[in-house]
Amino acid sequence: MSASILILATCHQVLADFNSYVVPQPHAQRDHRQDISQHYDYLMEENDEPLGRGAAPSKYRSSHGQAQHRPEMTESENFAQPNTESVFSSGGVDSYGETRDFLQFLRRIQYDHRQVPENEKGEATYVEVSVVVSNIRAVSEVTMDYALELFYRESWRDPRLQYDRKLFKNKTELALHESYTNFLWFPDTFVPNAIASKNPQRNSISHRSLLRLDETGKLLYSRRISLVCECTMDLTLFPFDKQLCKLGIESYGYTADHVVYKWSKGARTALELKKIRLPDFTIQEAYVTSQMESYATGNYSRLYVCFVFSRSSGFCFLQLIIPSTAVVITSWVSLWMETETEFQDMISIILAITFLIFSYNEMMPRVSYIKAMDIYLGVCFMIVFLSLIKLALVKYMRQKIMLTSDSGNSLREMSQMSTRQRLRARKTSNMNFRNNGGGSIPINEEHQQMLTVPNGEDKMANGDDKEANNNGKSHLSDMLEIRITQRTMHRFHWISQMLFFFGFVIFCLFYFLIYPNLHIVSVDPACDKNLAEWFADIY
């Protein structure tokens, strides 16, 4: 027991000695950041929305995390206050010393990020824009929009940011951290025809931006953007159509008197396309234009990126054109079938092409004009329907021919029976004459009538046959006004089949070779090729 107590006391003494020995921690970097952050009274934290028409006033976030209106600043403090905590915690591109020097430089020149840069001549600030399209994910005619991912780069000169390279270790260009976008003036660029923007979250791997400043005060800002933009389509020539989709770039709040956008020239081309493959379209052309847009608040400078998409008709051929053509050919084959189920087959064929038309309408947008595919499916449906009408006529002709044949057979049988009766009567009279020894014995009146009136009877029989035939002809002529024979039916059947076949072939040649060139596609004035400033290479 005493040994256990001694061991516990020894352990307690060792732990006490270890706690009393504290290794000093390197707090220099942390204290250095605290000193810099305490050097400023206010921390800037701007919203992502650019300053412009209808923009909310600038805000700063207090120590309690609540957004408050910025208090009035003295003249010496009227510049962009840096959020040093975000700068240093994220670890800028440059060293802490260079970052501190740039912050002191902004303080010394009393830089105000809310003020538009002013040139010496009082001209507007020119913003040079270049776009690199990395991917176009989808072009949808149902929702009439398209999705694309691009690298957007804009460059402008701010005379207030000119610096002496000696202040930054003789560097002619500074690579600034993306958090400096809160401290410098930026054009309030927006895309007028954008429906949605799927930008990645900040500080994520997919969200990166680039910010550079050279000694002349020229800024270069680049970032990755993902957009879904509307594209008004004309589907008159579907599936042989070409669609013109555009991407607008404009300042939201600054008129052309303050900010003018123009396409970049020189090392950074205005538009560049990576190797892009689309399932339903091919990019035929891509070019850029610029123009002025007038609003109630003034004139604004706008840039356009124009894409010309040519539809790949493979999907429509496999899903619509080939099945509808097969249905038409099947309707022709059923006309040559001599079965009682040919009408059921034709009804099934009509239901098949009707279902094909309904499924096509479900995948297309509701428009008020006729599309090229509507014409093709309509002609196929008309041919199948006319084939059904032709089948009914042929069946009617066949029944009439059978009725005519049956009536003729009955008349021939009646005439043959009367002829046999007359021959039998003649034979009986001759036998009676021989039995009388060839004398001139008068014969019975009945036999006399049968012997003396055979020619008249034959005439009457012939007259009855002619009358019956005339009655049959008049009855059929009342129905069809022509004499229907087996030859007539086969001739009608053959001629109609040839008309269907050659008519459909001529229609297909006209539809695929001539019709796509008859329609004149209207050109958007904003994407007039004659005004294009740059054409991108298509890979």
UniProtKB/Swiss-Prot annotation:
Residues 1-16 form the signal peptide. SUPFAM superfamilies: Neurotransmitter-gated ion-channel transmembrane pore (SSF90112), Nicotinic receptor ligand binding domain-like (SSF63712). The chain crosses the membrane at residues 315-335, 345-365, 374-394, 494-514. Disruption phenotype: Defective in enteric muscle contraction resulting in abnormal defecation cycles and moderate to severe constipation. Residues 17-314 are extracellular. Keywords: Cell membrane, Disulfide bond, Ion channel, Ion transport, Membrane, Receptor, Signal, Synapse, Transmembrane, Transmembrane helix, Transport. Expressed in the intestinal and anal depressor muscles but not in the sphincter muscle. Also detected in the RID and SABD ring interneurons, the ADE sensory neuron and the PDA motor neuron. Residues 395-493 are cytoplasmic. Disulfide bonds join C231-C245. PROSITE patterns: NEUROTR_ION_CHANNEL. One of its GO terms (biological process) is lipid transport involved in lipid storage. Changing D280N: In sa6; Defective enteric muscle contraction and shortening of defecation cycle. Reduced fatty acid uptake by intestinal cells. Pfam families: Neur_chan_LBD (PF02931), Neur_chan_memb (PF02932). It is found in: Synapse; Cell membrane. GABA receptor that functions as an excitatory cation channel. Permeable to monovalent cations such as Na(+) and K(+). Has negligible divalent cation permeability. Does not act as a chloride channel. Mediates enteric muscle contractions required for defecation. Probably by regulating the defecation motor program, required for fatty acid uptake by intestinal cells. Belongs to the ligand-gated ion channel (TC 1.A.9) family. Gamma-aminobutyric acid receptor (TC 1.A.9.5) subfamily. Resistant to channel blocking activity of mecamylamine and bicuculline. This is Gamma-aminobutyric acid receptor exp-1. It comes from Caenorhabditis elegans. The lineage of its organism: Eukaryota, Metazoa, Ecdysozoa, Nematoda, Chromadorea. The gene is exp-1.
